[in-house]
Amino acid sequence: MTTLLEKSKRLRTAHQAGFALLFSIAGPAWAQAVESSPATLWYGGPILTMAGDRPNMVDAVVERDGKIVYAGKVAQARKIAGTAAKEQNLGGATLLPGFVDAHSHFAMMMQVASGVDLQDPDHPINDIPSLIAALRTGIQARQIAPGGWVIAWQYDDAKLAEKRHITRADLDAAFPDHKIVLIHFTGHGLVTNSAAMAAAGITDSTPNPPGGITLRDASGKLTGVFFENAAYPVYLKIPPLSPEQRRAALDEAQRRYASNGFTHAQEGAASLGDMEALLKAGAQGLIKLDLALLPTSQTLDSLLGRPDVRFGSYQGHVKLAGIKFVLDGSPQARTGYFTRPYANGAPDGHHPWHGTPNMSQEAFNADAARAHSRGWQIFVHANGDAAIDMAIKGFDTLGLTKKADARPVVIHSQFQRPDQLKAYQRIGVGPAYFSNHTYYFADIHRSNFSADVVGFISPFASALKAGLQPSNHSDSPVTPLDPMTQLWSSMARQSKTGVVNGPDQRLTAWQGLHMLTTGPAWQVFEEKRKGQIKPGMLADFVILDKNPLTTPIEAIRSIKIMRTVKEGKTIWSAGQ
């Protein structure tokens, strides 16, 4: 693939200037000059260009060689497309730029596809016996032999009637011969049985690591519940997928993204193993959508010693986009780091509890400086306002400014204070917000924090007013990979119990679609290639059965994906 991004900002700017000049040439003359293969003409329905602050539509778009060569009137489009063009009548369906994933976990989706799914809608789990039954079914279906690892995903203790975590003792009684690991749906913790603990070298005398949370029973014995840094020893022992499993999981993960209209996906916390496997898959031509990888800060020492590692440019549809730092945990699991205490206390019940940072300010500053010195973009996970303070202090230590255009991204930025928006504006931070929290988790948040604090989570409207470039993400598999739910939640901000949180932060449909297209494209320096329908952009499209701009808010979630097109080629269509 032609590379438009380089590690050096100077080179990136030169590329962008060159393409801006190229596409300033008159459409028809340029299109005829470079005609090399039959074009495709799309027409017959609303085409949302996503250009500008107000709704902007055209009647037709022409694609040739994977790029858009014209967007405008049908008659002119036919002249430019030529007599050999293939015509695609939308039949009233709506076409817009392919969705750009602002943050999710592609590699984790591969694992979920190959593991036991604890949120299977056909087998709902509502108590510990039904959870154990689901694990037994998973073991039998996968024919996992005694002594083998059983990895289950999407574990949610809040759904259990017992109102507690399943424990090591529960799992030992049911599965004495397997190594059991239940990955919490937040991705920030897990529960294991004794066999898995032993494999990870964890005993009851193992101390709690800095930035880690372990739960113990009244006798001081570990319950098998580990969060944040305490979970890493177990994560590191989970065996990798076999080549056959990896290929099947890769195909399934791509299908899930493409079927939801995404032409650009992200692995937001890549290990070295993830990075190597996905780069190899890209080089083998196995990846059909664009995939941005964010290696975690734990990989930094290894990456700095490798001259072959390239950031910012695609290799077979895969690129290393930047380094990911995780400063805190999850507010719904009460592991996010706050300046104010949680009303419900710590996960083990003690008070006062503000959460804890996953790394020190000094460590973050030092490692971020090492990455920044190589020209690598900085991505930071920060949910609580205290963690966001840490991110801002680190950026200031690096001397980052909006003018420098380093575009640090703070993923989640959930419990942001108004004063922190001013710092984001000064530094040039791109906030990757998470509006699904207002639906899935706001009721939990309101039990811990005041209504005004919860009303300011994912403050889209305030961020736009401050001149920022926000995006919206699902953090899948934390919440479903469903862009229409993302759009709806950014417009409605309504919780599961019907409470509206922060009505002044609601977006219009047009603004909400920007958070799924232009916003995330800008955050990864791809605004010259993706996110809009105009000449020079990649022909990345999603086709919807209804127009979000004319669909009532309450019906937004019912909008269906009909087709996903990557660089002019259909990579998924309904009914496949």
Where are these regions (language model features)?
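Acidic (Asp/Glu)-rich catalytic clusters
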Residues: G282-Q284, V309-Q315, Y424-R426
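Divalent metal-binding segments
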Residues: E35-Y43, L48, G52-R306, A321, ...
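Boundary at the C-terminal end of the N-terminal hydrophobic targeting segment
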Residues: A29-A33
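Beta-rich accessory regions
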Residues: E567-K569, A574-G575
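N-terminal secretory signal peptides that target proteins for export/translocation
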Residues: M1-L11
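His/Asp/Glu-enriched, well-ordered alpha-helical/loop segment
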Residues: A368-F379, A386-P408, H412, P418-Q425, ...
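A generic structural signal for residues embedded in beta-strands
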Residues: Y70-A71, A152, F541-L544, S573
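Bacterial N-terminal signal peptides
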Residues: Q16-P28
